Amino acid sequence: MKLFTTVSLSVALVQALSFGSLNFGLDTFANRIIKTGPEHYELVSEATKIQYKRQGKKFIDVTSVVSIDDAVAQGMVASAGKSDVVTFFAKQIKSVKKPIPAYNYPTNASTQKVVQPLLKQIDLDRVKSNLGEFSSFYTRYYKSSTGLESADWLYGTVKDIVSVLPADAVELTKVHHDGWDQYSIIVSLVGKSSDKVVVGAHQDSINLLFPNLLRAPGADDDGSGTVTTLEALRLVVAAIATGLFTPHNTLEFHYYSAEEGGLLGSIDVFSRYYANNNTVVGMLQQDMTGYTKGTIDEGVEPHFGLISDYTSVGLNDFIKVIVAEYCSIPYHETQCGYACSDHASALENGYPASFLIESEFKYTAKQIHLTLDTLDRLDFGHIHEHIKLTVGYAIELSLAKHL
């Protein structure tokens, strides 16, 4: 067994190395500033970031927000000196904290006549086909050429979906980031108000064994969240195109680059929103929406995992209203720690955010970040429930006034 494993790994490495066009970034010793908790910053190398990911240690890479020189000058971190791998802890800087407004979210669903007809049009064959395409890229690692190719495929798919809308009803944006080629994608369905309702998912994948070399299909993490929100986008766009629905608040669907690098894409997006004084009344992250074997094996009913730590209580309560009204499974509250997905980037910039995952955290897929994160392991009936939730959230909150 050991020999077989060694040979298999060697073959995989040879195959990966033969992909000359992959063009992986190998800036292993570049210094980065990461935030590992509300009051902790560290100066680390890229190699240390990967090690932290392997250990399950969560963080936000804030290097694009605060330069290393400024961080040292402000006392956020100590100078790295001659070491590229030494980590440093520092106190929270008050200027980095941004208060989160309290909104008066609806306490009852009120748009059933719009939402219910759309839920009957969910096309799981389309969802499965999209995920098959998306997870077929060798990797969607944000520093790889195939990570850029997968972003191009996703952009083209989104562009086709919104092509039925008039030009003044939609804005489609590629958000380019400094330091890597994979871009984030923002679809903005223009409302009467510039206040934003955001649905998010991350498009990248990673193989933590050898990120620069090995295949990372990322079917569940986060291909499932991506196709969940793609189908919700298709249904919402169809409702707008047919006159069934016109958003009051501007409704946005975000597909973030480089979540696996420390929420790099989303922290860039929401930092720009903050700098431009944009208002976001709610952000819902869908990251891993398709795995139920962990719950079923333990004799637990399939359910949503509603993250209760480092999320917005008021928005979570609104999500509970949506689950009760439009979904066939319950939610279980669960915790995932600081900065466990892109909703943390919204919170860091003073925007209310929630995160819904496939189950309680202890039952979620364990094969993520490996070659084993494949489509055949997923439950599309469960993804169906996440789509229903996303459509309900998007329409109810985008039609809510006087928040």
Task: Tell what function each PLM region has.
Residues 291-403:
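Active-site-adjacent substrate-binding region
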